[in-house]
Amino acid sequence: RQMCIRDSLSTYKDFLDQQHYAEKFDSRSNLHSSVLEEFLYYLFKDLVGDFGENALIGKSHTFKDIFFVPPKYSEMLKRPYARIEKKDHDFVIGATIQVSFESAPPPEQDENPGEKVTLVKEEPENYTQVKVTGNTETHIFDIPVVAIECKTYLDKTMLEGSSRAAEDLKARNPNSLYIVVMEWIKLSSDVNLRKYKVDQIYVLRQQKNTDREYRYEEDYVKNPVNVAVVKHLFYKVRKHLTTDWSGGIEQGIKRGWLIDE
């Protein structure tokens, strides 16, 4: 299956890479990176579908942080005024979460400390809004378990940005996996990849980047997308999705090493 999807990607990209088409779009158009996003959807859709209809796959506006902005203290006692900061990701596998917040009396004053808050069933029109019912706020947002950044090529500045995004994601969701996928690489050999926070970098064509005009020369050889690289990506994501994340100190002691690999 991975080979069939790879072949479809290669055919589609060869069509778009023709000079009379490619010159109509610059790097800001995101045309070529969006092709990779679509490729990832078809690569993983059956795998993710096996987890059920609630599984999230595709481009997503995901949870980044939460903060509280009541206009004054007396209002904070009525409801929390929570705000969810979000971040765009090219491709994610994850879950959509609905949470409710409400202001409550301190535990020692609460006559029913074990009472559960009833979730509001009405969903906001979009993920940037909050549903307020009485003093209860309901928020909906996506949590990525796998986040994949799609690039035509990757240089050092881009890698630094990817590393910061990976660090932010893992601070909120330590069980997440952050991957960067590109066609070409534009990094020199003196770059130390171990200092960056991304979990893996995939170069689909296993080829250094060249300026676009050189790719139109007759003697330029463009490597095909390597199916072995695609398989490695697929198996890495599959392993992460099917691994038990509940390990801890006790299981680590039994192994003898605390951080599982």
Language-model-detected regions and their locations in the chain:
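Short, small-residue-biased leader/transition segments that mark boundaries at the very start
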Residues: 1-5
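Acidic-basic catalytic patches of nuclease active cores, encompassing PD-(D/E)XK
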Residues: 19-118
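Conserved catalytic cores of phosphodiester-cleaving nucleases, focusing on short active-site segments
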Residues: 91, 144-152, 162
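Active-site-proximal segments of catalytic enzyme domains
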Residues: 95, 114-142
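Short, flexible loop/turn elements at secondary-structure junctions
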Residues: 95-97, 151-154
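Active-site-adjacent loop/helix micro-motif of nuclease/hydrolase catalytic cores
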Residues: 101-104, 153-164, 171, 189
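Short His-Asn-centered micro-motif
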Residues: 148-153, 180-184
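Domain-level recognition of nuclease-like catalytic cores that cleave nucleotide substrates
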Residues: 165-172, 179-261
